[in-house]
A protein has these predicted regions:
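Detector for C-terminal structural segments
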Residues: 13, 151, 196-200, 205, ...
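N-terminal lobe/hinge region of extracytoplasmic solute-binding protein
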Residues: 33-83, 114, 185-187, 306
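A structural "hinge/loop" feature
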Residues: 37-52, 75-76, 102, 153-162, ...
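Gly/Pro-rich hinge or "lid" segments in bacterial periplasmic/extracellular proteins
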Residues: 70, 158-215, 219, 229, ...
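Aromatic- and charge-enriched surface segment that lines or borders ligand/interaction sites
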Residues: 77-121, 137, 143-147, 234, ...
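Surface-exposed binding/hinge segments that line
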Residues: 91, 125-170
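Structural transition elements
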Residues: 278, 313-347, 366-372
Length: 519
């Protein structure tokens, strides 16, 4: 069962940081299984999920968040909003150094906001859209000036959302092509040591880390294990101490006395996996076709047989873990193949002599559950006369096909929806987030003036009750227009050795910095 907020809080309490002063490193090596070899090791420029685990150890965020939802100091020691919500002042921690010895300063923050997050990050484009400029009155003060309020902005200042990059290494370059993306100079508890493409990424303890006595582990090794069955086997033999496994293996691994299974359903890491349509394809411009696909898919079957009950059927683009904003009273599409057939007939897509209406392709994100979901959808759509070819490819080719070449009909895509709808969910539906080449953004090319107004109103509304109403309207529009079909609100399941302790030190879970972890 998913950890409740109270249970997760207890877990955090049990893994609380040791006192900084006088603490000594514990040493040792932690080996983490990673499903694929990321192209980049900084998520400042990308929201690809395979980047987060390693990148969050190399870069600290300006803030972090406790399980109680309250912000905590990291690179920023103090923060304050102006009364009108149009200025956010950050007082930075003195003495922080980049891994090359250069001082961390407000100039790095200003550069990252203005030249990186707003321009190149799929989530950052909407998250920081209201930030007009960043003033730096002194090296340890950054003042974000906004055109309109952004009540969610503090939530975006964590490492997994908005990593500050070193201005002295990026300014004047094309950030996307900067060689430091593959071998970062960060400011976090671990430093980049080396990578062996397709094999492993090695990080070492940062001896100059600002939090004295941390990190407590000497070395992190991210071992590339593309086969999830191989991850389970490596956990069982002790070859790796932390990893994500096929959900079909979880029940078996729970019985292993040397392992522990953590299932976390929290807003910071909540996700909705969905079927996306390429709305540039003429066939999908007809709403009846999209509705037919929704009625042809049994999401309960997917939850039971592919996700093995780890999550819930998604009836909204906002996952239930985001309790403040989730609403279930929106248009839904029950499993009804007969209705799907009638809608396809009404759209003029009648069966031919061979019983076929359409022949299309479906591209799943690389990963066991997405691929199995695509295979199930192929089977389900075949029953209503739609032939789908499942195309499998590596991660880089998938991203290029969907977001750069736009050479796809449908795709199975998952992505972090939190910690706030303006940060994680809006990117899929906001017309201004359509930009070929930017991964995991508005890949459907959905554009609706009414939707944009709802999202932009919610993005700036300071009254919590009014903001919830804007997001209710958003959910109703999303489920009415149906540019993507929410399938499963998945919980995050990780398996670890019981020797690994204190690795959760924030609401970011395994995407925290591991400064307190011991093995």
């Amino acid at each position: 069962m998913p950890l409740t907020r109270r249970q997760f809080a207890a877990t955090l309490a049990g893994t609380a940081a040791l006192p900084s002063f006088g603490a000594e490193p514990g040493g040792g090596t932690l080996v983490i299984a990673q499903a694929s070899d990321p192209q980049s090791l900084t998520n400042a420029l990308s929201t690809e999920g395979n980047i987060y685990t390693a990148s969050s150890k190399l870069f600290d965020g300006l803030l972090t968040f406790g399980i109680d939802g309250k912000p905590q100091a990291r690179l920023a020691q103090q923060w304050a909003w102006s009364a009108d919500g149009l200025s956010l002042t950050l007082k930075l921690r003195p003495g922080v150094k980049w891994h090359d010895g250069q001082p961390f300063s407000a100039a790095d923050v200003a550069y990252s906001v203005e030249e990186v997050w707003k321009k190149y990050n799929a989530r950052g484009r909407s998250t920081f859209a209201n930030v007009e400029q960043v003033e730096t009155p002194d090296p340890l003060t950054a003042v974000l000036r906004l055109s309109r309020p952004a009540p969610y902005l503090l939530s975006a200042l964590v490492s997994i959302e908005s990593q500050v990059l070193p201005r002295h290494l990026y300014a004047g370059s094309n950030p996307l092509l900067n060689p430091h993306n593959a071998a970062p100079i960060g400011n976090g508890p671990f430093r980049f040591v080396r990578r062996e493409r397709g094999s492993q990424i090695v990080l070492g303890r940062n001896p100059d880390y600002w939090d004295r006595g941390h990190p407590r582990i000497e070395k992190l090794v991210f071992r590339i294990v593309p086969d999830l069955a191989g991850v389970a086997a490596a956990l069982e033999t002790g070859e790796v101490q932390l990893g994500t496994v096929a959900l079909a293996d979880v029940e078996r691994l729970q019985r292993n006395p040397s392992l522990q299974v953590s299932e976390i359903d929290q807003a910071f890491t909540a996700s909705v996996n969905a079927l996306e349509f390429n709305l540039d394809r003429p066939v999908f411009r007809d709403l009846r076709v999209r509705q037919a696909f929704a009625h042809a898919i049994d999401r309960g079957f997917i939850l039971k047989n592919i996700y093995h009950g780890h999550g819930s059927v998604a009836d909204s683009p906002i996952p239930p873990a985001m309790r403040e904003f989730y609403r279930g009273d929106v248009p839904t599409y029950a499993f009804d193949p007969a209705k799907a057939e009638a809608l396809l007939d009404a759209a003029g897509l009648r069966r031919n002599a061979q019983g076929l209406r359409l022949t299309l392709k479906i591209d799943p994100t690389p990963g066991a559950e997405a691929v199995q979901t695509a295979q199930y959808i192929r089977s389900a759509l075949a029953k209503v006369g739609v032939k789908l070819e499942v195309r499998n490819q590596d991660f880089a080719e998938f991203v290029n096909r969907i977001y750069t070449r736009r050479d796809f009909d449908t795709a199975v895509i998952g992505g972090n929806s939190g910690p706030d709808p303006a940060i994680g969910t809006q990117r899929w539906y906001w017309s201004k987030n359509f930009q070929p080449g930017v991964a995991f953004s508005n890949g459907t090319h959905y554009a609706s003036a009414e939707m944009d107004r709802a999202l932009e109103s919610a993005q700036t509304e300071l009254d919590p009750a009014k903001r919830r109403q804007h997001y209710l309207q958003f959910q109703r529009l999303a489920q009415t227009d149906l540019p993507r079909i929410p399938l499963i609100a998945a919980t995050r399941v990780v398996v670890s050795s019981k020797r690994l302790r204190n690795f959760i030190n924030s609401a970011e879970g395994i995407y925290g910095n591991f400064a307190d972890a011991t093995v």
